[in-house]
Amino acid sequence: MNAEIIAVGTELLLGQIANTNAQFLSEKLASIGINVYYHTVVGDNNKRLQKAIEAAEERADILIFTGGLGPTKDDLTKETIAASLDEELVYDEKALALISNYFKRTGREFTENNKKQALVLNGATVFANDHGMAPGMGVNKNRKSYILLPGPPKEMKPMYVSYVEPFLRNFTTGENIYSRVLRFFGIGESQLEVKVQDLIDGQTNPTIAPLANDGEVTLRLTAKHQNVSEAEKLIQHVEDLILERVGEFFYGYDQEFLHYKAIELLKRKGLTLACAESLTGGLFGNQVTENAGVSSVFKGGVICYHNDVKQYVLRVPEEVLHTDGAVSKECARYLAENVKDVLKADIGISFTGVAGPDASEQKEPGTVFVGLSIKDEPTVVFPLNLSGSRQQIRERTAKYGFYHLYKKLEEI
């Protein structure tokens, strides 16, 4: 079965909000074996919406609409689809009572336009809105299925999970779709693809989809099977083949981001961490503290942006700052070692470099040094040559910090 997602709302076309509903629905539909080949966005205009409906009917079995179910004049989705299908709109008594009770409870006037939210297509399966007012609905006609959902994600997502997915499962073949994301760092997308190109070229079931994202590369493995455990076996076989070739760059699965993996390993090792941040200006420490329970391993950090802080707080010798510069291997080494000592941690990590857009100390933007000092281990400094905008360089530097921390922790 093929579906098309039609998002209705001029605010989407103006870029005022992102179409996160389409991403959510595509992922959920794929998991139950429904293909999505088109996303359409159309403004609050009945003529253009009608054209979008006609185009979708030519290429999809299931048309899923988000948005346009509210009380205002520009909420046109129900009316346009009713006219297109030559169906009446009727009041759903449960929804009408829910809306009426809300206005009574809040002491507000229950106006005629608010009643509009309780209108549904005649004969439709009604999906209760447990987090808002306008119900969703599903109707089958002319060998097509039309699903109408509210636009706000906080209403649409729980409605889909509770009511729409069970409704849609009636149209699926019973095949389950199982996906696993493999995460890699320290290798470019093109390099990784070359190493697994024959597997990508020969893919059938499971499929392999590479994606590069801000210094990382992921491979999404997706298998179809009526039995979930069999789908998992198919994926495991391909994963084993991939990791035989590029396993040195692999660090985690699915939502296991670098900062999470590094901090979890710190906890398991029972070690503590401190950071000295010049270039990154607190980005690294901020990501550290996104992890719950991190106070057991994170002593704190020093944002040593000015050379005075490097010299007087973290004791980088004046000679190093004048001779080698703040952006240097020697400075990164002192910062990592001394923040570890000052904050009495087991591990010190440091970041210094040039984010751009201009050069500094006659060093080009993207020149970066990450220092890592671990007790009873020699200090290591990792030189990096990064590209991108100022913000991208800073964010990628922080990621490299987590990556090198994770890899060193694996070794000890």
Curated annotation (Swiss-Prot):
Domain of life according to the entry: Bacteria
Alphabetized Pfam families for the sequence: CinA, CinA_KH, MoCF_biosynth
UniProt family annotation: Belongs to the CinA family.
Protein name: Putative competence-damage inducible protein
